[in-house]
Amino acid sequence: MASGWDLASTYTPTTPSPQLALAPAQGYLPCMGPRDNSQLRPPEAESLSKTPKRRKKRYLRHDKPPYTYLAMIALVIQAAPFRRLKLAQIIRQVQAVFPFFRDDYEGWKDSIRHNLSSNRCFHKVPKDPAKPQAKGNFWAVDVSLIPAEALRLQNTALCRRWQNRGTHRAFAKDLSPYVLHGQPYQPPSPPPPPREGFSIKSLLGDPGKESTWPQHPGLPGQSTAAQAGTLSKGEEGMGTGPSSSSETPLWPLCSLPGPTIIEGESSQGEVIRPSPVTPDQGSWPLHLLEDSADSRGVPRRGSRASLWGQLPTSYLPIYTPNVVMPLATLPTTSCPQCPSSASPAYWSVGTESQGSQDLLCDLDSLFQGVPPNKSIYDVWVSHPRDLAAPAPGWLLSWYSM
């Protein structure tokens, strides 16, 4: 159609202006200002661009003296015998007077050198007048050229902390009496050490000192009946015989071969002596298991120590750990019909006699006073089908608690 609208005739392509075409390349955007390149950076680049700040090393072992280096140098020089010191001597004297300078901090030595050369009050005293430029010269101080404020306590962080807390000041307020008038200077006393907590040293103490264990006054043979029967909780199984304070062992278990018994007094007035304990590893003090009787027939129950039920036999001092202790034979007077523990009939290995089952029941009740042996218990548990008789009921109930 001639009269119709021609799309191709009306369409004219447009080309961008040179300014807009070059805008992205030059960092400009249309209708906007310059492009911010920092917003387009990845976060990793920002973290790398920021260098971490180094933490300042702090020296908190001792309080820094609240004095000027001029005052401290003048103090040690005036305290010298000839009122002069070398540089190395000044450094050593400052370290001796003020503990702060004994630490790892070394920068203060440069401050000493700087103050010696920059202050007019310090002057060199040549060691050899013919060689004034030689090293190792002495330094002296002219006290008339020292400013008065340089010898006073400075307004440091330490002084401000003292004022806020109201604590005792360890340093003198003014060094003028010590520098100008030659009074002896007393270094600040170190703070008291902190109170020690619980430690093994507090229990053991110093071997050179006397024992701190409580002593029980009294002569042998005059102890009370309570001491003759049983021991105190802290002294069970340990001897407390009469001895001087200098000979008292600090740790009684280390010097005694085994448990001993306190001497007591029977009801008849007879003094009961402790029975000897054999240090042999293969034997066991049988007198601790049975009640021996004296010649008059009076049982000596006062000499029996209450050791059973306190510790397993493997932990007693006369036996090494996990050593099987031989079972003690029971007294014949307590059970005349009971077979010996060493006989095969007792352990059901040999031929059993008539009524052996009843005897084992009696043994179960009689062995209530015998201490349990953990090593024997372990053997019984690990070998339940052994030929030997099963463990008594009291032993199983002892370790099942």
From Swiss-Prot:
GO terms for molecular function: bHLH transcription factor binding; co-SMAD binding; DNA binding; DNA-binding transcription activator activity, RNA polymerase II-specific; DNA-binding transcription factor activity; nuclear androgen receptor binding; protein domain specific binding; R-SMAD binding. CDD domains: FH_FOXH. One of its GO terms (biological process) is positive regulation of transcription by RNA polymerase II. A motif (Fast/FoxH1 motif 2 (FM2)) lies at residues 321-327. Residues 64-163 bind DNA. It is found in: Nucleus. Residues 307-390 are annotated as: SMAD-interaction domain (SID). The keyword Transcription applies. Keywords: Activator, DNA-binding, Nucleus, Transcription, Transcription regulation. Residues 221-230 have a biased composition (Polar residues). A motif (SMAD interaction motif (SIM)) lies at residues 363-384. Transcriptional activator. Recognizes and binds to the DNA sequence 5'-TGT[GT][GT]ATT-3'. Required for induction of the goosecoid (GSC) promoter by TGF-beta or activin signaling. Forms a transcriptionally active complex containing FOXH1/SMAD2/SMAD4 on a site on the GSC promoter called TARE (TGF-beta/activin response element). This is Forkhead box protein H1. It comes from Mus musculus.
